């Protein structure tokens, strides 16, 4: 016997289909809004990722941006040299040429007078160049894991003649490498692959982390940044804690947080360039005494990745891991393209469309 739907049943079926269609459309619309939370300990490269989004997905740095970053470059450069000078005393390193002591006093005086954001005078520039060329300063620089030094110190100090020029304008790379502590939450908007991204960069130092809670609602994915090169360094805010151990502890608390049960987690093992150089001289056993492998980039990076992945206690949660160099625009462009594809697939799956 045939099964004929009554008019009422047909109307109910049409209503059901319409509701399902609306739900799917709502799902697609929701899937187009992506809220990304950029987390990680201090100095892991989060703010550099944000700057890259400005280069890749917006119009890069404006004339006003360049103007604002210029004093930051001056400050980062002279503050880095002053940090090495101070460490000379702490570590008991002698200058190659004793006459450099007068140069070091000039540098430290400029910093103590808070004139570090101003263009370098000809006299100051000469003093800085002599200092950076000193064998004792270079020896102290090579021991930078024993004190706190900006990652970009060598980059800036190798460019002193360019940065010290009267007509100096910061390049894109100069701006990418600037270091300013993030306080509070910085929000960035951009569109990519028909998705509307809202990217939240949150201060990573311990004092800033209590502010993260405000960002927890409706997060599409978390990008968690780790400085691979921090494995043999201690924190700025607590010189008894290894930076990599701090990142692992933080990742554990984020990955297994009740707020993020259904949130995709993307792990950026960042500063791979610095790590590749450092691992040749500084063994991974400084951080992981039980590490059995060789001190090659491939083996050591793979071991660190395993340490982070093992913190995930949810059998249904996948950690998407990428080795990154946040100052390399091409690398970040390729990685972010892959991250976006993961987000699209996961969003569609969440809407039952994939």
Swiss-Prot record:
A lipid is attached at residues 3, 351 (S-palmitoyl cysteine). The GTPase activity is promoted by GTPAse activators, such as RGS14, RGS16 and RGS19. The gene is Gnao1. The record marks 351 as: Not S-palmitoylated. The modification Deamidated asparagine is found at residue 346. G proteins are composed of 3 units; alpha, beta and gamma. The alpha chain contains the guanine nucleotide binding site. Forms a complex with GNB1 and GNG3. Interacts with RGS14. Interacts with RGS16. Interacts with RGS19. Interacts (when palmitoylated) with ADGRG3. It comes from the Eukaryota. GTP binds at residues 43, 46-48, 152, 176-179, 270, 273, 325. Its EC number is 3.6.5.-. Guanine nucleotide-binding proteins (G proteins) function as transducers downstream of G protein-coupled receptors (GPCRs) in numerous signaling cascades. The alpha chain contains the guanine nucleotide binding site and alternates between an active, GTP-bound state and an inactive, GDP-bound state. Signaling by an activated GPCR promotes GDP release and GTP binding. The alpha subunit has a low GTPase activity that converts bound GTP to GDP, thereby terminating the signal. Both GDP release and GTP hydrolysis are modulated by numerous regulatory proteins. It is an enzyme of class 3 (hydrolase). It is a lipid-anchor. Its main location: membrane. Residues 174-182 are annotated as: G2 motif. Residues 32-354 form the G-alpha domain. It is found in: Cell membrane; Membrane. Residues 266-273 are annotated as: G4 motif. The modification 5-glutamyl histamine is found at residue 205. Residues 35-48 are annotated as: G1 motif. GO terms for cellular component: cell body; cytoplasm; dendrite; GABA-ergic synapse; glutamatergic synapse; heterotrimeric G-protein complex; myelin sheath; parallel fiber to Purkinje cell synapse. This is Guanine nucleotide-binding protein G(o) subunit alpha. Deamidation of Asn-346 converts alpha-1 to alpha-3. Keywords: Cell membrane, GTP-binding, Hydrolase, Lipoprotein, Magnesium, Membrane, Metal-binding, Myristate, Nucleotide-binding, Palmitate, Transducer. GO terms for biological process: adenylate cyclase-inhibiting serotonin receptor signaling pathway; adenylate cyclase-modulating G protein-coupled receptor signaling pathway; forebrain development; G protein-coupled dopamine receptor signaling pathway; G protein-coupled receptor signaling pathway; locomotory behavior; negative regulation of calcium ion transport; negative regulation of insulin secretion. Residues 197-206 are annotated as: G3 motif. It holds the Pfam family G-alpha.
């Amino acid at each position: 016997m045939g099964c004929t739907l009554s008019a009422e049943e047909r109307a109910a079926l049409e209503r059901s289909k319409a509701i399902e269609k609306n739900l799917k459309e709502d799902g697609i619309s929701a899937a187009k809004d992506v809220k990304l939370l950029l987390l990680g300990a201090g100095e892991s490269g989060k703010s550099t990722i944000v700057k890259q989004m400005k280069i890749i997905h917006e119009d890069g740095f404006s004339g006003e941006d360049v103007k604002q970053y210029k004093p930051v470059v001056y400050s980062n450069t002279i503050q880095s040299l002053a940090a090495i000078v101070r460490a000379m005393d702490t570590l008991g390193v002698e200058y190659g040429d004793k006459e450099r002591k007068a140069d070091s006093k000039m540098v430290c005086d400029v910093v103590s007078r808070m004139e570090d954001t101003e263009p370098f005078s000809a006299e100051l520039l000469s003093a800085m160049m002599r200092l950076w060329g000193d064998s004792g300063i270079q020896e102290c620089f090579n021991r930078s894991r024993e004190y706190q030094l900006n990652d970009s110190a060598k980059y800036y100090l190798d460019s002193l003649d360019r940065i010290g020029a009267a007509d100096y304008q910061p390049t894109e790379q100069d701006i990418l490498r600037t270091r300013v502590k993030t306080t509070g939450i910085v929000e960035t908007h951009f569109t990519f692959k028909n998705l509307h991204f809202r990217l939240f960069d949150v201060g990573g130092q311990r004092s800033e982390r209590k502010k993260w809670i405000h960002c927890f609602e409706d997060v599409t994915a978390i990008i968690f940044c780790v400085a691979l090169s921090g494995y043999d360094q201690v924190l700025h805010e607590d010189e008894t804690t290894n930076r990599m151990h701090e990142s692992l502890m933080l990742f554990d608390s984020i990955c297994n947080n009740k707020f993020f049960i259904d949130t995709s987690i993307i792990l950026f093992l960042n500063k791979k360039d610095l790590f590749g150089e450092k691992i040749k001289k500084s063994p991974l056993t400084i951080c992981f005494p039980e590490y059995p492998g060789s001190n090659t980039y491939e083996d050591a990076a793979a071991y660190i990745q395993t340490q982070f992945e093992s913190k995930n206690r949810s059998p249904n949660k996948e950690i998407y891991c990428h080795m990154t160099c946040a100052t390399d625009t091409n690398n970040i462009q390729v990685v972010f393209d892959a991250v976006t594809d993961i987000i699209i697939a996961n969003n569609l799956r969440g809407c039952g469309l994939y």
